[in-house]
């Protein structure tokens, strides 16, 4: 029972709603997409979404999800086009939640992408730490592209084959502020 419309001892009339019953086993995810992306919606195949209450990114593919419909236009009351999915909920997603949705299409060939955990942001400037040798890292500014919620496309600033820090980025960032010269952290 999601909500009760009447209390104990209340009088009711014929046709009056007494309670709202909901199920949370199969849920519907509705993404509202700006009209400026209307031409790209035909390529959408699935989605990932991030919940605000646990910060976790869920994959519809891993939850038995499927695309139900892509709107042909807005409904006249909003400037957004609906894209609707259905998925199996094991109880971890709260029905009615507002989530951040990442629409997915076919993979792009020759695209360089890194885990979101590898990217740092300082005053709107995005960077990754590139490993030069086992004890030396350099902070490199990058230009970001599309994201699927777990990885982000790198448009500029990084080349294929370079080794980056994807875990422990905060520690490397803090070490860069210490002024220690890599390889010379001992006392003289």
Model region roles, listed by residue range:
Residues 1, 11, 21-23, 29-30, ...:
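Short beta-strand-turn/beta-hairpin segments enriched in glycine/proline and small hydrophobics
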Residues 13, 24-28, 62, 78-82, ...:
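Extracytoplasmic
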Residues 26-27, 34-83, 107, 121-127:
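Beta-strand/loop subdomains of soluble extracytoplasmic proteins
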Residues 110-118:
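Sequence-composition feature that favors extended, apolar/low-complexity stretches
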Residues 125-188:
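Short alpha-helical boundary/capping segments at helix-coil junctions
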Residues 20, 42-56, 93-109, 162-167:
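A short, hydrophobic beta-strand micro-motif
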Residues 5-8, 12-13, 32-38, 68-71, ...:
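Surface-exposed strand-loop junctions at beta-sheet edges and helix termini
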Residues 1-37, 94-100:
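Surface-exposed patches in structured soluble domains
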